[in-house]
A protein has these predicted regions:
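Acyl-donor (CoA/ACP) binding surface of acyl/acetyltransferases
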Residues: 1-34, 58-166
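Conserved GNAT-fold acetyl-CoA-binding loop/helix
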Residues: 28-50
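PAS/PAS-like sensory domains
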Residues: 53-57
Length: 166
């Protein structure tokens, strides 16, 4: 398929409605919504994520050898803001760093959009330190530390790291 991104173990292909439904099924499992969005899940959030966000260029991540979906990656092109998610059962296998590295190279070079981009921004919750460390391994640098108001398990403020790749 046009604009597929291939790595040694993965294929990042255009996301289908079935791929998005699989993501929703995984992320609505216990504790996954908090990890992904930083807020306690409720019916409004679950309803909100049933449709992909408008303006985000999504790719589904599949294993090259089996075609099995392991997560997704996307970028909100207007802000060059990266988002990604690997299903729980596929974590700690370095799929995330493999997908992020390949995706940002394709995005920055214009392969995905026909437009060159000069940066990618990623934000992650303090509670998700492994994501920040992975982003640093693929070349992101810390850009800012902040807070966002949300319903955290302990209080109403969640810390965030903002990282940048140029």
């Amino acid at each position: 398929m046009q604009n597929d991104i291939k790595t040694e173990r993965l294929i990042l292909h255009e996301m289908t409605a079935a791929d998005w439904a699989e993501y929703v099924a995984h992320v609505t499992e216990a504790d996954e919504l908090f990890v992904q969005y930083g807020i306690e899940p409720d019916e409004r959030l679950i309803e909100f994520i049933k449709e992909p966000t408008i303006g985000v260029l999504y790719r589904s991540i599949a294993l090259r050898d089996t075609g099995e979906t392991v997560g997704y990656i996307g970028v909100y092109e207007e802000e060059d803001n990266l988002e990604f998610y690997v299903f729980r059962e596929y974590r700690r296998r370095h799929y995330c760093s493999e997908e992020v590295g390949a995706f940002i190279k394709a995005y920055l070079s214009g392969v995905l959009t026909g437009t060159l981009h000069d940066r990618v921004i990623a934000e992650t919750l303090w509670e998700n330190g492994p994501a920040a460390e992975m982003l640093k391994r693929v070349g992101f640098v810390s850009d800012a530390v902040g807070f966002k108001l949300s319903e955290n398990r302990e209080n109403n403020i969640t810390g965030t790291w903002r990282l940048k790749y140029e």
